[in-house]
Each structure stands twice: as structure tokens, then as C-alpha cells.
Amino acid sequence: KIIENAGASAITVHGRTREEFYTGHADWDMIKKVKESVKIPVIGNGDIKTKEDALKMFKETNVDGVMVGRGALGNPWIFRDIIQYLQGEEILKITNNEKLQIMLEHINLEVKEKGENVAIKEMRKHISYYIKNLPNATIIRNEINKIDKQDELVACLTEYFNKLWIEIN
């Protein structure tokens, strides 16, 4: 209420305390109570990892919007999926080729923004999220952690996804 009275046009509520950090579950009941106590839009955040989680938060808390955090790591298309899901549209599963193309674009943008040395090191963690749950992810992750050049990283990922395509088909 204090924030609303101070002139805020919206409030984002993360259903965890600083002490809880990433442990346990976000307190959606608290988010719902905030929504019920103010007239300005409330955006709920916490434990949104799937399109179904987003719908569930909307239904359970009556928030005006949802914010996705860690659920977007390695899964940036979650935003498209949520919108399509909420609109009742068919959700097209992302292919491994599309995933590779997104990773390569991510690498290019990161290198352009931060330079090769910093970007390749930072991309290691992002790639780990992208390939999570894919076959041989641990092996490829170990290889990627030794790479410090963009062209080597691109070649490694391309080879991995080509092998993946052959194994699947």
C-alpha cells in the first residue's frame, strides 16, 4: 500500500525473501494478498518455469502479469510459449536445429557486446542451460569448458547437434 500511495504505477512481487534466495517454493499466497490490497497492476514472480506455471499463477493470484526469471535460462522461447498458451494457440516444440541457431545467435550477440574472451567464458553457463536434458550433455559441457575461441565453440556445438540429429533420425 505504501508503494502505491507513493505513486508507483505497478508492483512486481517475488514470492521469496532475500534469506530464502532460491530455496523452497515462492509464496504465491503472499503475491495474491498484495494483489488484493492495491489498485495498481501487480506482476507476480517466482517458480515460473513453464507455460503451465504462468497460467496457474494468473489463476491462483489474479495478477496482471507474470515475470519469468530462471525459467528462461536456456529456454528463451518460454515467453512465446506462454503467450501462445494463454491465447489458446498451438505450441510448436522447438527443434534441436532451432535451438542450435538460437545458441549461435546468442554467442554472436554476446561476442559483439563483450568481446570474445569474456563472452565465450560467460556463454559456457548459458550453453549448459540450453543443452540440459539432451543426450551426452555432460560430455559436451566438459568439452565446452575448455574452449575459449568463438569459432571453436561454434564448431563444437554444430558437430554435437549434427550428431544429435543423426542419432534421433
Where are these regions (language model features)?
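Alpha/beta catalytic cores of nucleotide-metabolism and tRNA/nucleoside-modifying enzymes
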Residues: K1-A10, Y22, D29, K33-G44, ...
